[in-house]
A protein has these predicted regions:
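Thiamine diphosphate
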Residues: 4-130
Length: 130
């Protein structure tokens, strides 16, 4: 079982325990202890389908962005696959910056600079529509 699945399972167990033990001291999952101290955006990235990362979204406070390779057989190398499905380092940076823009931490101009710097084509067809 991968770490993501263990994190989700443990968070579900804690949630269940808290529901059926309302008068006892409520437990906190590892995800909550690790990520919920501050309400900051989380960007979860996987070479698997986006839904794999989305499994932990309900247990993370703050905005949550999942990137994943929702398909296969589209590229000859892992690098090309990540670029095609928009999960390479450039899209990760852009997603993180955009999350900070949405939080009001940085200005939209920073996202525009990232798009320009990394030659991200905003007219590129969405990978899930191809």
């Amino acid at each position: 079982m991968c770490i993501r699945d263990r994190l989700r399972r443990e968070a579900e167990e804690v949630e269940r325990w808290n529901i059926i033990n309302p008068s006892k001291k409520q437990k906190e999952s590892h995800l909550a202890r690790s990520l919920n101290k501050h309400s900051v955006p989380t960007v979860a990235v996987s070479d698997y389908v986006k839904m794999a990362s989305e499994q932990i979204a309900p247990y993370v406070s703050g905005s949550f962005y999942a990137l994943g390779t929702d398909g296969f057989g589209r590229s000859d190398t892992r690098e090309n696959l990540r670029h095609f499905f928009e999960v390479d380092r450039y899209y990760i940076v852009l997603t993180a910056i955009r999350a900070l823009v949405d939080e009001g931490v940085v200005k939209m101009s920073v996202a525009n600079e990232v798009i320009k710097k990394y030659n991200i084509d905003s007219n590129k067809p969405s990978p899930i529509s191809i």
